[in-house]
């Protein structure tokens, strides 16, 4: 018999006693939107219809700790017995020598308690298979759960990314680049329940279609973690060329990033988003020193999330490979910062010097306001 449903287990939601029902409701909505299917909930479990494609998609939904394809049957011993035998047969091979029965019941009126179920179905397996019991390190775990309406039998458990459901912790406007760090940082925020909206600065014709294509490919990946990801593309060419006119060229990147933050600050506040986020990693490049971060982030009073601040690069790469963003980030394409960077960028910029140079750019704030309005007019 084929599997009828997929049983879904919550992540940290079981610890959130006070707001548990709200978190579960948000998770249920997220699963429905990403899978485009009906979600049933029962006690501390959720169920969706079984489809092979769902097994991959459920691995990336924040708030889910694990899930299992399950056989569903009536809550009668003879029915459960048949499913246990079939599921065991399906999951044993020449290397399977030991087993363990794991029983659980939310229906306390069922005729056997959990210990009695373990003994009953353990005896059944011993009679029908050449297997031995091993409760510490079995080759095969046979799970039996008795719910309010049905019983469920399964052997396989797939693990998801855990965390909290997206939208349970607010929103952030994320400064997205085509590099390795920024996409990983965004997904780490999603895992903590943040709904992430994206702001990406492009500079045509200096950045080509490959750059935009990379961003759209990243959007497809983000949609595995959160439904309906929005990426706002900002044509920054005019301002980038304008900043190139300053007298101290070493400050070009610092002034550009200060400008990014002013634009992000205004957009976030107009959209009632309470935080700005990025993929900054301390000391990795000139714009990611403490002095640079102070100089740049002074342009907003919003909370700034830097989830990768103290990470090792190899750990970021490993996670990017797991999330399928690394393969996209490493596609060759032109990046604004690379094209714009001076030979020797300042690594310890000061706010006073940056403000002095910005006085040379009389129209920069006007140009930034134009970009803000263009983004807000996007659907």
UniProtKB/Swiss-Prot annotation:
Pathway: Cofactor biosynthesis; thiamine diphosphate biosynthesis. The keyword Cell wall biogenesis/degradation does not apply. It is found in: Cytoplasm. It is an enzyme of class 2 (transferase). GO terms for biological process: thiamine biosynthetic process; thiamine diphosphate biosynthetic process; thiazole biosynthetic process; tRNA 4-thiouridine biosynthesis. ATP binds at residues 175-176, 257, 279, 288. GO terms for molecular function: ATP binding; CCA tRNA nucleotidyltransferase activity; tRNA binding; tRNA-uracil-4 sulfurtransferase activity. Keywords: ATP-binding, Cytoplasm, Nucleotide-binding, RNA-binding, Thiamine biosynthesis, Transferase, tRNA-binding. It comes from the Bacteria. Its main location: cytoplasm. It catalyses: [ThiI sulfur-carrier protein]-S-sulfanyl-L-cysteine + a uridine in tRNA + 2 reduced [2Fe-2S]-[ferredoxin] + ATP + H(+) = [ThiI sulfur-carrier protein]-L-cysteine + a 4-thiouridine in tRNA + 2 oxidized [2Fe-2S]-[ferredoxin] + AMP + diphosphate; [ThiS sulfur-carrier protein]-C-terminal Gly-Gly-AMP + S-sulfanyl-L-cysteinyl-[cysteine desulfurase] + AH2 = [ThiS sulfur-carrier protein]-C-terminal-Gly-aminoethanethioate + L-cysteinyl-[cysteine desulfurase] + A + AMP + 2 H(+). Its EC number is 2.8.1.4. Residues 52-157 form the THUMP domain. One of its GO terms (cellular component) is cytosol. CDD domains: PPase_ThiI, THUMP_ThiI. It holds the Pfam family ThiI_fer. Belongs to the ThiI family. Catalyzes the ATP-dependent transfer of a sulfur to tRNA to produce 4-thiouridine in position 8 of tRNAs, which functions as a near-UV photosensor. Also catalyzes the transfer of sulfur to the sulfur carrier protein ThiS, forming ThiS-thiocarboxylate. This is a step in the synthesis of thiazole, in the thiamine biosynthesis pathway. The sulfur is donated as persulfide by IscS. HAMAP family: ThiI. This is Probable tRNA sulfurtransferase. It comes from Mycoplasmopsis pulmonis (strain UAB CTIP).
């Amino acid at each position: 018999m084929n599997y009828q449903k997929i049983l879904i287990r919550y992540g940290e939601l079981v610890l959130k006693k006070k707001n548990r029902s709200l978190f579960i409701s948000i998770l249920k909505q997220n699963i429905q939107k990403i899978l485009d299917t009906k979600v049933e909930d029962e006690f501390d479990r959720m169920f969706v219809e079984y489809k092979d494609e769902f097994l991959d998609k459920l691995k990336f939904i924040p708030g889910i700790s694990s899930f299992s394809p399950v056989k569903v049957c009536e809550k009668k011993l003879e029915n459960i017995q048949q499913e246990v035998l079939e599921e065991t047969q399906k999951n044993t091979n020449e290397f399977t020598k030991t087993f363990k029965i794991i029983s659980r019941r939310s229906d306390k009126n069922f005729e056997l308690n959990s210990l009695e179920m373990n003994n009953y179905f353990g005896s059944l397996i011993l009679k029908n298979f050449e297997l031995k019991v091993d409760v510490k390190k079995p080759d095969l775990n046979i799970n039996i759960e008795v719910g309010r309406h049905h019983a469920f039998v399964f052997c396989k458990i797939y693990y998801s990314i855990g965390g909290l459901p997206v939208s349970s912790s607010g929103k952030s406007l994320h400064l997205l680049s085509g590099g390795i760090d920024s996409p990983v940082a965004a997904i780490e925020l999603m895992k903590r329940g943040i709904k992430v909206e994206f702001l990406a600065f492009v500079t045509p014709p200096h950045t080509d279609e490959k750059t935009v294509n990379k961003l759209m490919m990243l959007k497809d990946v983000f949609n595995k973690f959160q439904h309906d990801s929005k990426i706002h593309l900002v044509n920054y060419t005019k301002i980038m060329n304008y900043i190139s006119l300053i007298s101290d060229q070493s400050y070009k990147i610092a002034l550009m990033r200060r400008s990014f933050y002013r634009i992000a600050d205004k957009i976030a506040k107009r959209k009632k988003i309470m935080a700005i986020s990025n993929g900054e990693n301390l000391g990795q490049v000139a714009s990611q020193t403490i002095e640079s971060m102070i100089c740049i982030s002074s342009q907003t009073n919003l909370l700034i999330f830097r989830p990768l601040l103290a990470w090792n690069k190899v750990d970021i790469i490993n996670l990017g490979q797991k999330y399928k963003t690394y393969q996209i980030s490493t596609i060759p394409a032109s990046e604004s910062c690379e094209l714009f960077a001076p030979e020797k960028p300042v690594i310890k910029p000061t706010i006073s010097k940056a403000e002095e140079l910005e006085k040379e750019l009389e129209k920069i704030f006007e140009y930034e306001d134009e970009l803000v309005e263009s983004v807000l007019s996007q659907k």
